[in-house]
Amino acid sequence: MADGSSDAAREPRPAPAPIRRRSSNYRAYATEPHAKKKSKISASRKLQLKTLLLQIAKQELEREAEERRGEKGRALSTRCQPLELAGLGFAELQDLCRQLHARVDKVDEERYDIEAKVTKNITEIADLTQKIFDLRGKFKRPTLRRVRISADAMMQALLGARAKESLDLRAHLKQVKKEDTEKENREVGDWRKNIDALSGMEGRKKKFES
């Protein structure tokens, strides 16, 4: 018996069912402070990892900058060869300067031509992009300003000379004179009196005579 009671005591108790809150308490539950879940990584470890990532990124940037400087130096060394000025006279130095100026002018012309081609390509790309947007119907709408205009002015702007004809709605209506309505009222009279007059023997006699 003792062993059975000890086994029952060792068994874990079932977790209680979660309490379902009412909809009226949702707002209070959302605003009340809750115990935040503790992350598996401590704050000091997070700071250490951030510092390490920043150091790695800094090293990568420095390495890329060094590679760009090396490529620039290699390109300049291949294109701009060192000048041999030892033992040159005044006339030879003048000729060398003329040659260098001619090379500079040629490079400037090539640079201008390349820039013109790039500008032309950019404009062509922009035109083609605009044509694509026009074909798709996705054009940029201009900004419209609010303008106060009456209905008459709007119809005048849309229809022109036909606006007056369309706005004159009473022209197509049938005009009824007041005298005609009074005459009809006199002829009809009170319908109750007509029914009373035609009811009974006298009414039948009147119908027979008519």
Curated annotation (Swiss-Prot):
Q: Which positions does the record annotate as the modified residue Phosphoserine?
A: S5, S6, S23, S24, S42, S44, S77, S150, S166, S199
Q: Where is this region: Involved in binding TNC?
A: 32-79
The effect annotated for D190H is: In CMH7 and RCM1
List every stretch annotated Involved in binding TNC and actin.
129-149
Q: Which InterPro entries match?
A: Troponin, Troponin-I_N, Troponin_I, Troponin_sf
**Record's keyword annotation contains Acetylation:** yes
Q: Which residues carry this modification: Phosphotyrosine?
A: Y26
A Gene Ontology CC term for this entry?
A: cardiac myofibril
Post-translational modification here is noted as:
Phosphorylated at Ser-42 and Ser-44 by PRKCE; phosphorylation increases myocardium contractile dysfunction. Phosphorylated at Ser-23 and Ser-24 by PRKD1; phosphorylation reduces myofilament calcium sensitivity. Phosphorylated preferentially at Thr-31. Phosphorylation by STK4/MST1 alters its binding affinity to TNNC1 (cardiac Tn-C) and TNNT2 (cardiac Tn-T).
Q: Where is this site: Involved in TNI-TNT interactions?
A: C80, C97
| Alphabetic keyword roster | Acetylation, Actin-binding, Cardiomyopathy, Disease variant, Muscle protein, Phosphoprotein
Molecular functions (GO terms):
actin binding; actin filament binding; calcium channel inhibitor activity; calcium-dependent protein binding; protein domain specific binding; protein kinase binding; troponin C binding; troponin T binding
Entry keyword Signal: no
* N-acetylalanine PTM positions: A2
Q: Which residues carry this modification: Phosphothreonine?
A: T31, T51, T78, T129, T143, T181
Q: In its UniProt record, which GO terms are filed under biological process? A: cardiac muscle contraction; heart contraction; heart development; intracellular calcium ion homeostasis; muscle filament sliding; negative regulation of ATP-dependent activity; regulation of cardiac muscle contraction by calcium ion signaling; regulation of smooth muscle contraction
Question: Quick one: where's region Disordered?
Answer: 1-43
Q: Which PANTHER family match?
A: TROPONIN I, TROPONIN I, CARDIAC MUSCLE
Cited function: Troponin I is the inhibitory subunit of troponin, the thin filament regulatory complex which confers calcium-sensitivity to striated muscle actomyosin ATPase activity.
The record's similarity note reads: Belongs to the troponin I family.
Q: How does it assemble?
A: Binds to actin and tropomyosin. Interacts with TRIM63. Interacts with STK4/MST1.
Name of this chain's protein: Troponin I, cardiac muscle
